[in-house]
């Protein structure tokens, strides 16, 4: 039997005490760190999904542009090479707490965004390309994907900010020391970068 203040408690009373203790701990934020950790990881997965979606659109986009503007080989090559680097960058399991790996991923995606932006500027010189039905369909898909990338990045920024704040403040800092010593602050995109890097899809 469980003894409380000198009084022995039976099975039912003991169960009630354990439930109340659990609710008290939950109310004090014992589960907040793992909950925010999962939310940040889910947001990161969506970021990866949307960047991959963009990468999947690029080969068809390049081929379509090439059909109307083959002389723009320099810009087309830049896009192809930037895509290759972005899709080949290593994503280790600890990327969210690995500053170097996160930085390399970020740089690769930013380079691809820059190359795409330069390609879209070139497109302005070719009215026939801008009216091509296949290109219009790709334009719509790319525009939607860029919007989803922006949303996914913003969601990740917020999720990581909440998680990192919990690790630094009380009571999260206490729970981290007691129960989650392996929890580390996560890397994040900067808000200013998020607003400047995504290419604008306007034709």
Label every model-predicted segment.
Residues 2-4, 9, 16-203:
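A helix-centric hydrophobic-segment signal that preferentially recognizes long
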């Amino acid at each position: 039997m469980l003894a409380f203040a000198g009084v022995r408690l039976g099975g039912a009373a003991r169960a009630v005490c354990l439930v109340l203790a659990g609710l008290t701990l939950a109310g004090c934020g014992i589960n907040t760190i793992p909950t925010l950790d999962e939310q940040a990881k889910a947001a990161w997965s969506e970021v990866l999904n949307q960047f991959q979606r963009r990468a999947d659109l690029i080969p068809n986009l390049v081929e379509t542009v090439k059909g109307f503007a083959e002389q723009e080989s320099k810009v087309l090559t830049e896009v192809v090479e930037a895509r290759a680097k972005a899709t080949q960058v290593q994503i280790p399991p600890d990327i969210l707490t690995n500053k170097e790996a996160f930085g390399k991923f970020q740089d690769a995606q930013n380079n691809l965004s820059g190359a795409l932006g330069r390609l879209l500027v070139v497109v302005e010189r070719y009215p026939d390309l801008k009216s091509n039905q296949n290109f219009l369909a790709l334009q719509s898909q790319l525009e939607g994907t860029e919007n989803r990338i922006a949303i996914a990045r913003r969601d990740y920024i917020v999720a990581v900010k909440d998680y990192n704040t919990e690790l630094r403040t009380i009571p999260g800092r206490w729970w981290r020391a007691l129960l989650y010593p392996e929890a580390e602050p996560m890397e994040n995109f900067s808000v200013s970068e998020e607003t400047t890097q995504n290419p604008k899809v306007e034709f």
